Amino acid sequence: ERQFTDDQLKLLIERGAVIGGVFDAWMVVPGWERGKTLPKEAGVKLEHVVDHIDHVCQLAGNTRHSGIGTDLDGGYGLEQTPSDMDTIADLQRLPGLFRARGYTDDDIADIMHGNFIRFLREAWA
């Protein structure tokens, strides 16, 4: 399951949206029970976040509509983040995970920050 259906994602893509991949486990794996399920026992890893971002890229046919939407601003802690993520510094591992799937350095830069910057520049122009 995903937070958005494919039909919803396609509509967002058609409107030029940038969709941020989230790290809150309930949005990453099915069957998550807040306060009961733990990331390690559920097997939640950064790779799952990359799966979701890759899915958006596949639906769009490019990387222009995907970004990192971490939500790591204090709304939750390690009890709901991927088990292989200890600090925000672990976000630096994402480019390697994308590279292993064949993404180019330009595509990775767009996903990591470029798409949101482009989107905001266009919105504010």
Language-model region placement:
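Short, well-ordered secondary-structure micro-motifs
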Residues: 1, 31-32, 78-79
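Mid-to-C-terminal alpha-helical segments outside catalytic/metal-binding sites
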Residues: 86-125
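Histidine/acidic residue-rich metal-binding segments in metalloenzymes
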Residues: 1-17, 47-64
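Outer-membrane beta-barrel pore domains
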Residues: 39-46, 75-85, 98-107
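Short, electropositive alpha-helical surface patch
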Residues: 41-58, 80-93, 121-125
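Short acidic/histidine-rich active-site segments
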Residues: 21-23, 60-85
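Alpha-helical transmembrane segments and their immediate juxtamembrane cytosolic regions
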Residues: 12, 20-47, 57-59, 73, ...
